[in-house]
Design a protein with these regions (language model features):
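Hydrophobic alpha-helical segments, chiefly the membrane-spanning helices
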Residues: 1-257
Length: 257
C-alpha cells in the first residue's frame, strides 16, 4: 500500500486527468494543452524521481542499516521540499474556496481545527473498515495480498481525493490539478516510505520492484516531455493508463514472461 500510492498517482490518476482534458477538448471547451507552472511541476517531478531511485537502490542492496539511514534522509528531504514549496509564488489560477463550515459560521480559525479533526476521524474509521474488507476479499478470491494491496488500496485511499484534480481541470486551474497529484507523490514517496523502512522488514518481491519501475518510468516520461516542450499536452499523458494496464497484466500473471 505504501508503494502503491505513488504508482497509482503517476499512472491511473495522470491518465484520468488526461482523459478529462481530452473530453473537454472534444466538447469544445478547451484545447489539449495543460497550462501548468513548469518550474513548480518540474521540481516536484525531480524530487520524486531522485527519492524513488534511492528507494529502489536501497531496496536492492538489502542492508538494514541503509534502511534506517534512508528513512532519516527522506524525512529531511521532505522538509527541504516543504521549504522550497513555501517559497513558490502562487500563479494566477491558484485561488482557493473557503471551508464548508465558513458558509454557516463565518471565518474562524477554530473551524479549521474542527473540520480537520472530523476529516481525520472519518479517514481513520474508513481505514479500519477498508483493511478488514481487504483481508476478507483477498482471501476469498485467492489473490496475493501484496498484489491486491498494490492495486486496490491506493485506488480506494488516494483516487477519491484526486477528484479535486478533475474538478480543478474543469475549472481551468491546471497547475492546481497537476500539483495536487505531484505534491501527494512527494509526500507518499518520502514520509510514508520512511515509516515502511523503519517499521517493516522492507523485503520487496518482483511485484513491488515492477511497481516502483513503472512509477519511475511514468514520472521520467512526464519530466522529459515537460523539459523539452516547456508545456504538457493531454495526449502523451495517456501513457499512464498503459503503464497501469501493463502492471495488472504482469502482476496478475495474465501473460507469462
Amino acid at each position: 500500500a505504501i508503494l502503491g500510492a505513488p504508482f497509482m498517482l503517476f499512472t491511473l490518476a495522470i491518465f484520468l486527468l488526461a482523459v478529462t482534458v481530452l473530453t473537454l477538448k472534444f466538447m469544445g471547451k478547451r484545447d489539449s494543452a495543460i497550462k501548468v507552472n513548469p518550474e513548480l511541476i518540474s521540481f516536484d517531478l525531480k524530487f520524486f524521481i531522485f527519492a524513488f531511485f534511492l528507494i529502489l537502490a536501497v531496496s536492492l542492496i538489502k542492508i538494514k542499516f541503509l534502511n534506517y539511514a534512508l528513512a532519516a534522509f527522506l524525512v529531511l528531504f521532505y522538509l527541504f521540499y516543504i521549504k522550497k514549496i513555501l517559497e513558490h509564488e502562487a500563479a494566477g489560477d491558484e485561488t482557493y474556496h473557503p471551508l464548508h463550515f465558513e458558509k454557516y459560521f463565518g471565518k474562524k480559525h477554530v473551524l479549521i481545527y474542527i473540520q480537520t479533526a472530523l476529516g481525520l476521524i472519518l479517514i481513520i474509521s474508513g481505514a479500519h473498515f477498508f483493511i478488514g474488507f481487504l483481508i476478507v476479499t483477498g482471501t476469498a478470491i485467492g489473490i496475493s495480498m501484496l498484489v491486491f494491496s498494490l492495486l486496490i488500496t491506493p485506488i480506494a485511499t488516494e483516487l477519491p481525493e484526486k477528484y479535486n484534480s478533475i474538478t480543478w481541470i474543469i475549472r481551468g486551474k491546471d497547475t492546481l490539478a497537476l500539483a495536487n497529484i505531484t505534491g501527494a507523490v512527494a509526500f507518499q514517496s518520502t514520509l510514508i516510505v520512511s515509516i515502511g523502512l523503519l517499521f517493516t522488514e522492507w523485503i520487496l518481491d518482483w511485484h513491488t520492484l515492477l511497481n516502483i519501475t513503472l512509477a519511475l518510468s511514468s514520472a521520467i516520461f512526464i519530466f522529459i516531455t515537460l523539459k523539452f516542450k516547456k508545456k504538457l499536452y493531454a495526449e502523451p499523458l495517456l501513457i499512464g493508463g498503459l503503464f497501469y494496464v501493463i502492471y495488472i497484466i504482469l502482476a496478475l500473471e495474465l501473460v507469462k514472461i
